[in-house]
Amino acid sequence: MNTYKTYSERGQQHPNACARSLFELMERNESNLSVAVDVTTKKELLSIADAVGPFVCVLKTHIDIVEDFDHDLVAQLEQLAKKHDFLIFEDRKFADIGNTVKHQYANGIYKIASWSHITNAHTVPGEGIIKGLGEVGLPLGRGLLLLAEMSSKGALTKGSYTSESVEMARRNKDFVFGFIAQHKMNEHDDEDFVVMSPGVGLDVKGDGLGQQYRTPHEVIVESGGDIIIVGRGIYGNPDQVEAQAKRYRQAGWDAYLERVRLHKK
Protein backbone atom coordinates (compact mmCIF):
# COMPACT_ATOMS: atom_id res chain seq x y z
CA MET A 1 0.00 0.00 0.00
CA ASN A 2 1.29 3.47 -0.94
CA THR A 3 0.74 4.83 2.58
CA TYR A 4 3.66 2.75 3.83
CA LYS A 5 6.19 3.72 1.15
CA THR A 6 8.75 6.47 1.64
CA TYR A 7 7.71 10.01 0.82
CA SER A 8 10.32 10.01 -1.93
CA GLU A 9 8.85 6.90 -3.58
CA ARG A 10 5.35 8.33 -3.33
CA GLY A 11 6.47 11.62 -4.86
CA GLN A 12 7.97 9.91 -7.90
CA GLN A 13 4.73 8.18 -8.85
CA HIS A 14 2.04 10.63 -7.74
CA PRO A 15 -0.41 11.87 -10.43
CA ASN A 16 -0.88 15.28 -8.79
CA ALA A 17 1.75 17.99 -9.35
CA CYS A 18 1.16 19.65 -5.99
CA ALA A 19 1.53 16.32 -4.15
CA ARG A 20 4.75 15.55 -6.03
CA SER A 21 6.21 18.88 -4.93
CA LEU A 22 5.05 18.28 -1.37
CA PHE A 23 6.55 14.79 -1.05
CA GLU A 24 9.87 15.94 -2.53
CA LEU A 25 9.95 18.87 -0.12
CA MET A 26 9.13 16.64 2.88
CA GLU A 27 11.96 14.25 2.03
CA ARG A 28 14.38 17.10 1.35
CA ASN A 29 13.62 18.88 4.63
CA GLU A 30 12.98 15.75 6.71
CA SER A 31 9.71 17.20 7.93
CA ASN A 32 6.08 16.10 7.99
CA LEU A 33 5.06 18.98 10.23
CA SER A 34 2.44 21.56 9.34
CA VAL A 35 2.01 24.49 11.69
CA ALA A 36 -1.46 26.03 11.89
CA VAL A 37 -0.89 29.74 12.47
CA ASP A 38 -4.25 30.98 13.75
CA VAL A 39 -3.37 34.52 14.79
CA THR A 40 -5.12 37.80 14.09
CA THR A 41 -2.33 40.23 13.17
CA LYS A 42 0.03 40.47 10.23
CA LYS A 43 3.01 40.94 12.54
CA GLU A 44 2.27 37.76 14.54
CA LEU A 45 1.63 35.69 11.43
CA LEU A 46 4.88 36.71 9.73
CA SER A 47 6.90 36.37 12.93
CA ILE A 48 5.67 32.83 13.60
CA ALA A 49 6.00 31.85 9.93
CA ASP A 50 9.63 32.95 9.92
CA ALA A 51 10.38 31.18 13.22
CA VAL A 52 8.81 27.83 12.29
CA GLY A 53 9.65 28.01 8.58
CA PRO A 54 12.88 25.96 8.74
CA PHE A 55 11.05 23.07 10.44
CA VAL A 56 7.79 22.72 8.48
CA CYS A 57 6.70 21.30 5.16
CA VAL A 58 3.41 23.23 5.15
CA LEU A 59 2.34 26.49 6.78
CA LYS A 60 -1.42 26.52 7.37
CA THR A 61 -3.18 29.89 7.47
CA HIS A 62 -6.63 31.32 8.17
CA ILE A 63 -6.11 34.51 6.23
CA ASP A 64 -9.62 35.84 6.92
CA ILE A 65 -8.97 36.21 10.67
CA VAL A 66 -6.05 38.61 10.12
CA GLU A 67 -7.45 42.00 11.11
CA ASP A 68 -4.86 44.10 9.26
CA PHE A 69 -4.65 41.95 6.12
CA ASP A 70 -3.05 43.55 3.06
CA HIS A 71 -1.34 42.28 -0.05
CA ASP A 72 2.08 42.98 1.40
CA LEU A 73 1.29 40.19 3.89
CA VAL A 74 0.76 37.78 1.00
CA ALA A 75 3.97 38.93 -0.69
CA GLN A 76 5.96 38.42 2.52
CA LEU A 77 4.40 34.99 3.10
CA GLU A 78 5.41 33.96 -0.41
CA GLN A 79 8.96 35.18 0.24
CA LEU A 80 9.12 33.16 3.47
CA ALA A 81 7.84 30.06 1.65
CA LYS A 82 10.71 30.39 -0.82
CA LYS A 83 13.28 31.23 1.86
CA HIS A 84 12.41 28.27 4.09
CA ASP A 85 11.15 25.85 1.41
CA PHE A 86 7.58 25.19 2.53
CA LEU A 87 4.14 25.20 0.90
CA ILE A 88 1.28 27.47 1.98
CA PHE A 89 -2.10 25.94 2.82
CA GLU A 90 -4.99 28.38 3.20
CA ASP A 91 -7.46 26.49 5.37
CA ARG A 92 -10.50 28.08 3.72
CA LYS A 93 -12.88 25.09 3.99
CA PHE A 94 -14.95 26.09 0.97
CA ALA A 95 -18.54 24.88 1.29
CA ASP A 96 -20.70 26.43 -1.45
CA ILE A 97 -21.82 25.57 -4.98
CA GLY A 98 -19.23 25.37 -7.74
CA ASN A 99 -19.86 28.75 -9.33
CA THR A 100 -19.64 30.56 -6.00
CA VAL A 101 -16.48 28.87 -4.73
CA LYS A 102 -14.78 29.52 -8.05
CA HIS A 103 -15.05 33.26 -7.37
CA GLN A 104 -14.24 32.92 -3.67
CA TYR A 105 -11.05 31.07 -4.62
CA ALA A 106 -9.87 33.33 -7.46
CA ASN A 107 -11.26 36.73 -6.56
CA GLY A 108 -12.42 38.89 -3.65
CA ILE A 109 -9.89 40.66 -1.47
CA TYR A 110 -7.84 37.54 -0.70
CA LYS A 111 -7.31 36.04 -4.19
CA ILE A 112 -6.39 32.76 -2.49
CA ALA A 113 -5.55 30.78 -5.62
CA SER A 114 -2.83 33.24 -6.58
CA TRP A 115 -0.65 32.49 -3.53
CA SER A 116 -1.86 29.38 -1.67
CA HIS A 117 -0.44 26.09 -2.99
CA ILE A 118 -3.07 24.04 -1.15
CA THR A 119 -6.63 24.68 -0.05
CA ASN A 120 -9.52 22.54 1.17
CA ALA A 121 -13.25 22.05 0.87
CA HIS A 122 -16.23 20.41 2.52
CA THR A 123 -18.05 17.93 0.29
CA VAL A 124 -21.53 18.86 1.58
CA PRO A 125 -22.48 20.71 -1.66
CA GLY A 126 -21.57 17.69 -3.83
CA GLU A 127 -18.99 17.20 -6.55
CA GLY A 128 -19.64 20.58 -8.17
CA ILE A 129 -17.49 22.21 -5.51
CA ILE A 130 -14.46 20.25 -6.74
CA LYS A 131 -15.18 21.12 -10.37
CA GLY A 132 -15.56 24.83 -9.57
CA LEU A 133 -12.35 25.04 -7.55
CA GLY A 134 -10.53 22.92 -10.12
CA GLU A 135 -11.33 25.35 -12.93
CA VAL A 136 -9.26 27.91 -11.05
CA GLY A 137 -6.67 25.78 -9.28
CA LEU A 138 -5.66 23.17 -11.84
CA PRO A 139 -4.13 25.59 -14.38
CA LEU A 140 -2.08 27.07 -11.51
CA GLY A 141 -0.78 23.69 -10.33
CA ARG A 142 -2.66 23.92 -7.04
CA GLY A 143 -3.93 21.01 -4.96
CA LEU A 144 -7.16 20.39 -3.06
CA LEU A 145 -7.78 18.51 0.17
CA LEU A 146 -11.26 17.30 1.11
CA LEU A 147 -12.50 17.36 4.69
CA ALA A 148 -13.27 13.72 5.34
CA GLU A 149 -12.96 13.75 9.13
CA MET A 150 -12.46 16.47 11.74
CA SER A 151 -10.72 16.26 15.10
CA SER A 152 -13.37 18.06 17.15
CA LYS A 153 -15.69 16.18 19.49
CA GLY A 154 -19.15 15.48 18.03
CA ALA A 155 -18.10 16.20 14.42
CA LEU A 156 -20.64 14.93 11.86
CA THR A 157 -17.91 14.03 9.35
CA LYS A 158 -18.11 10.26 9.67
CA GLY A 159 -19.69 7.14 8.17
CA SER A 160 -21.27 7.64 4.75
CA TYR A 161 -20.14 11.28 4.64
CA THR A 162 -16.53 10.15 4.83
CA SER A 163 -16.93 7.29 2.34
CA GLU A 164 -18.74 9.53 -0.18
CA SER A 165 -15.96 12.10 0.16
CA VAL A 166 -13.40 9.42 -0.68
CA GLU A 167 -15.38 8.41 -3.78
CA MET A 168 -15.44 12.04 -4.95
CA ALA A 169 -11.68 12.24 -4.49
CA ARG A 170 -11.18 9.06 -6.54
CA ARG A 171 -13.07 10.63 -9.43
CA ASN A 172 -10.99 13.82 -9.29
CA LYS A 173 -7.41 12.69 -8.67
CA ASP A 174 -5.97 15.33 -10.98
CA PHE A 175 -6.87 18.04 -8.45
CA VAL A 176 -7.79 16.31 -5.18
CA PHE A 177 -4.62 14.83 -3.72
CA GLY A 178 -5.69 14.09 -0.18
CA PHE A 179 -7.78 14.67 2.89
CA ILE A 180 -8.03 16.34 6.21
CA ALA A 181 -8.67 13.16 8.16
CA GLN A 182 -7.79 11.14 11.23
CA HIS A 183 -6.55 7.97 9.52
CA LYS A 184 -5.29 6.70 6.16
CA MET A 185 -7.71 6.73 3.24
CA ASN A 186 -5.86 4.53 0.76
CA GLU A 187 -7.63 1.24 0.09
CA HIS A 188 -6.40 0.36 -3.40
CA ASP A 189 -2.91 -0.06 -4.85
CA ASP A 190 -3.50 2.54 -7.55
CA GLU A 191 -4.31 5.42 -5.17
CA ASP A 192 -2.19 7.58 -2.93
CA PHE A 193 -4.10 10.14 -0.92
CA VAL A 194 -2.11 12.39 1.38
CA VAL A 195 -3.67 12.63 4.84
CA MET A 196 -3.10 15.75 6.90
CA SER A 197 -4.23 15.22 10.48
CA PRO A 198 -5.13 18.06 12.84
CA GLY A 199 -5.46 17.74 16.59
CA VAL A 200 -1.88 16.74 17.36
CA GLY A 201 -0.35 17.46 20.76
CA LEU A 202 2.53 16.08 22.81
CA ASP A 203 1.47 17.57 26.15
CA VAL A 204 -2.35 17.80 26.34
CA LYS A 205 -5.38 15.70 25.38
CA GLY A 206 -7.95 18.49 24.86
CA ASP A 207 -8.58 22.24 25.03
CA GLY A 208 -11.97 22.50 26.77
CA LEU A 209 -13.62 23.61 23.50
CA GLY A 210 -14.06 20.17 21.96
CA GLN A 211 -10.62 19.72 20.39
CA GLN A 212 -9.16 16.27 21.00
CA TYR A 213 -5.41 15.72 20.71
CA ARG A 214 -3.35 12.70 19.63
CA THR A 215 0.42 12.21 19.57
CA PRO A 216 2.48 12.12 16.34
CA HIS A 217 3.04 8.39 16.91
CA GLU A 218 -0.71 7.76 17.15
CA VAL A 219 -1.38 9.77 14.00
CA ILE A 220 1.42 8.47 11.77
CA VAL A 221 2.29 4.96 12.96
CA GLU A 222 -1.05 3.77 14.33
CA SER A 223 -3.50 5.63 12.06
CA GLY A 224 -1.54 6.08 8.82
CA GLY A 225 -1.65 9.87 8.64
CA ASP A 226 1.08 11.60 6.61
CA ILE A 227 1.37 15.14 7.95
CA ILE A 228 0.76 16.30 11.51
CA ILE A 229 -0.94 19.67 11.98
CA VAL A 230 0.04 21.48 15.17
CA GLY A 231 -1.05 24.93 16.28
CA ARG A 232 -1.08 26.21 19.84
CA GLY A 233 1.27 23.44 20.98
CA ILE A 234 4.00 25.24 19.03
CA TYR A 235 3.26 28.96 19.28
CA GLY A 236 1.23 29.00 22.52
CA ASN A 237 4.33 30.13 24.41
CA PRO A 238 6.03 32.92 22.41
CA ASP A 239 9.43 32.15 23.95
CA GLN A 240 9.28 28.50 22.91
CA VAL A 241 8.16 28.69 19.27
CA GLU A 242 11.39 27.53 17.64
CA ALA A 243 12.13 24.88 20.29
CA GLN A 244 8.62 23.43 20.05
CA ALA A 245 8.72 23.43 16.24
CA LYS A 246 11.98 21.44 16.38
CA ARG A 247 10.46 19.07 18.94
CA TYR A 248 7.33 18.34 16.90
CA ARG A 249 9.27 18.05 13.66
CA GLN A 250 11.53 15.43 15.26
CA ALA A 251 8.60 13.53 16.78
CA GLY A 252 6.76 13.49 13.45
CA TRP A 253 9.80 12.42 11.45
CA ASP A 254 10.73 9.69 13.94
CA ALA A 255 7.18 8.33 13.69
CA TYR A 256 7.40 8.31 9.88
CA LEU A 257 10.74 6.45 9.93
CA GLU A 258 9.26 3.91 12.33
CA ARG A 259 6.27 3.37 10.03
CA VAL A 260 8.52 2.82 7.01
CA ARG A 261 10.62 0.37 9.04
CA LEU A 262 7.60 -1.58 10.27
CA HIS A 263 6.19 -2.05 6.77
CA LYS A 264 9.39 -2.76 4.87
CA LYS A 265 9.05 -5.93 2.83
Curated annotation (Swiss-Prot):
The active site is at K93 (proton donor). Substrate binds at residues 38, 60-62, 91-100, 213, 232. It catalyses: orotidine 5'-phosphate + H(+) = UMP + CO2. Pfam families: OMPdecase (PF00215). Gene3D superfamilies: Aldolase class I (3.20.20.70). The keyword Cell cycle does not apply. The keyword tRNA-binding does not apply. One of its GO terms (molecular function) is orotate phosphoribosyltransferase activity. Belongs to the OMP decarboxylase family. This is Orotidine 5'-phosphate decarboxylase. It comes from Mucor circinelloides f. lusitanicus. The gene is pyrG.
